[in-house]
């Protein structure tokens, strides 16, 4: 597996652990359909949360949050609808969160979480 893929996988593990520590329940991970992939699907109380995870070694190419623009947010909303259809679930309270993981491999990774970004 490529170093980039390993970093991404580690970031998703850290993000899932962080979300669980915040009281969320992870219900699906790496769900795919023809339109794309959802990194993490979680329940936060009555809300369905679609979490996009962005992991970086450094800020050299910008903060991980900067990698989630308008087009990506629109795709995540479409994916949320597709996930609900696929699971025959009607969840009126949906939100998209972004979890940023900064992990240079030398120290404690930093996890940051933006709720309801779009």
Swiss-Prot record:
It comes from the Bacteria. One of its GO terms (molecular function) is nucleic acid binding. SUPFAM superfamilies: Restriction endonuclease-like. Pfam families: UPF0102. HAMAP family: UPF0102. Belongs to the UPF0102 family. This is UPF0102 protein Arth_2474.
């Amino acid at each position: 597996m490529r170093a980039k893929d390993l970093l991404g996988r580690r970031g998703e593990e850290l993000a899932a652990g962080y979300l669980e520590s915040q009281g969320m329940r992870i219900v699906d991970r790496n769900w795919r359909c023809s339109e794309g992939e959802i990194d993490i699907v979680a329940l936060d109380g009555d809300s369905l949360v679609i979490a996009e995870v962005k992991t970086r070694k450094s800020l050299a190419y910008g903060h991980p949050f900067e990698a989630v623009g308008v087009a990506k947010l629109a795709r995540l909303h479409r994916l949320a609808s597709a996930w609900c259809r696929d699971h025959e679930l009607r969840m009126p309270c949906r939100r998209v969160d972004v979890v940023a993981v900064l992990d240079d491999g030398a120290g404690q990774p930093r996890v940051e979480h933006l709720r309801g970004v779009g």
